Amino acid sequence: MNVRVLPDVSGLDKEFDYAVPESMVPSIAVGAMVRVELANRRVDGWVTAINPPDVTSNSALRDILKFRGIGPSAEVIVSATTIAEKFMGRRRAILTMASPDTLVSALPADRRHASYPGGGQLADLHSRGGGLIWCGVHQDPTELLRSIARHGSLLAVVPALRTARMVASEMRGSGFSVALMPDDWAQAAAGVDVIIGARGSVWAPMVAPSSIVVWDEHDESLNEERVPTWNTRDVAIERAANTGAACFFVSPTPSPQALEWAQGRIYASDDKDTWQGVKVIDMASDGPVIGSFSSELLEAARDRSKTVLCVTNSTGVGRLLVCKQCKSVARCENCDSLVVQSTDSTL
């Protein structure tokens, strides 16, 4: 057996061919983490192909020095190649994120349970390959994730690890087996009902995934700032296409990219918690004599059942002139229009 290896070397995005010793053959698979000799140095790397058709003769190949552990799946290798090309980066950075933090030589038992698909609009959306879930501002992630997880193994990506821990605990309480990334990488690779974590978990290993969910897909923390600068949304779409999983984006304020991708596959959740109303008040509408606040703001503030937030111009920014004593706004003596003070102190 011979393999193609991508070395874990900064600045190098080239693959090299190696022979596999007979003792290592049972352990080697696409994505396996190995150690090889390169330019008289011992370096780590990932197996990207087995028995490639254009390999040179085995007699001219150096042997792999060591099998280090189980690494990203073959599907992750393919997805990483596509994303790296799309965002003008190197695969090494992605495969490092997709690899376990500690070496894994063997996987635990598969802990997946049977799936019980339910009805409703989410079931229809799942059968169509997923879509956009337009939720309320404070939508509880657990409720929606439970509904989606009943269709099969689920990968959920949330903006913050704190949120991931909370949801993981609640999903375990609901009877699902859960892998919290990155600590439970080995269990995720073996098989669980729910895999959940922050941005990097979008590269988590999956066994026969049914759904991939990106929660709060509009959140900027789901953008990778290091090269390649991928977005979790793009990776989820790519991996869903490669695995046949349904892809869901959940957000109270969906991004234009998510709306365009959904193409009408939109489900509005039953959460009634929506954004509060925003009003822009023209201070001149109250007439020539006004105070620092409009009459509409004062009326709303008197209602003790409401919480009102007022955003006003900071001192020194407003260019209108108001009398300090009578609060009259300076107006043109001919047409009664409001006047502003220019930089040379003229009206």
Question: What is each of the regions a protein language model found here?
Answer:
Residues M1-G291, E299-G316, C326:
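Accessory, non-ATPase domains that flank or precede helicase/AAA+ motor cores in DNA-metabolism machines
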Residues N313-L347:
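Conserved helicase/translocase motor-coupling segment
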